[in-house]
Amino acid sequence: MKLFRILDPFTLTLITVVLLASFFPARGDFVPFFENLTTAAIALLFFMHGAKLSREAIIAGGGHWRLHLWVMCSTFVLFPILGVLFAWWKPVNVDPMLYSGFLYLCILPATVQSAIAFTSMAGGNVAAAVCSASASSLLGIFLSPLLVGLVMNVHGAGGSLEQVGKIMLQLLLPFVLGHLSRPWIGDWVSRNKKWIAKTDQTSILLVVYTAFSEAVVNGIWHKVGWGSLLFIVVVSCVLLAIVIVVNVFMARRLSFNKADEITIVFCGSKKSLANGIPMANILFPTSVIGMMVLPLMIFHQIQLMVCAVLARRYKRQTEQLQAQQESSADKA
């Protein structure tokens, strides 16, 4: 019973989706169906966020340079330093490609949709999350290949205009259209916040099912033994824990408020599976891609589950803080 109190309904749903993808992955004609459905859900998510946020909130979020600077440092400085130290240390005797895979993971940009969705679920600064996560993803398309070439001796990597266009089309365009639609649908969105929250959660579940289905179809459970798999899980948990603790410490050290702390935690601790796998296809030989992205695929699932728990905890804290503020205002 204690486990069920720790794992809230959404986290349990996440685990169920992972198990569903493990036993019943999307195959054949269902693959493009779920890919298109996921794309549509993400576009709807950003459309609704655009409609929900006021012009003042967006301007304030975009101008929050201290927050954006730290998120970029967490993504492109803290993570790579940890990856280099870990690959140099090699504490366990496993396939060297797994160490290279973790190093590659640490170089990647932040994931966008889940970072923003979790920020929204937790009551964080969504406007800043949209700006910070989108900027990280766009910058990573050019910066990550350069870092790969620098620390992994892989050359010939460059930014993809197609990837930039995809981010603009799937994320920023729906957000802008939603915001432009705010005069007509803004009141409806404000009255249906619970439905908007369901959109956040549904988009995350679809991303998890689609990503894990692809991993299962590609033989994720046959590529490594149980010992190596346990190694990946433990290292992923330790790496994620270090980054989250550092982000929380720095957010409080730099005197960010609770909403900004939430944004920093969720935007500064994520790594993008959506960018990482296509980029690996360009940067590495086909024969090693599976092993290179295996740590990323497992880390991706762990970060979603851990952040689901954190989002619920932050949400309770945010609701308690709001209740205290409202109570103080009534007494005044």
Curated annotation (Swiss-Prot):
Keyword Metal-binding: no
Keyword Transport: yes
Gene3D superfamilies reported for this sequence: 1.20.1530.20
InterPro entries associated with the record: Na+/solute_symporter_sf, Put_Na-Bile_cotransptr
GO molecular function: symporter activity
One GO location term (cellular component): plasma membrane
Pfam families for this protein: SBF_like
UniProtKB keywords: Symport, Transport
Family: Belongs to the bile acid:sodium symporter (BASS) (TC 2.A.28) family.
Protein name stated in the entry: Putative symporter YfeH
Gene source species: Escherichia coli (strain K12)
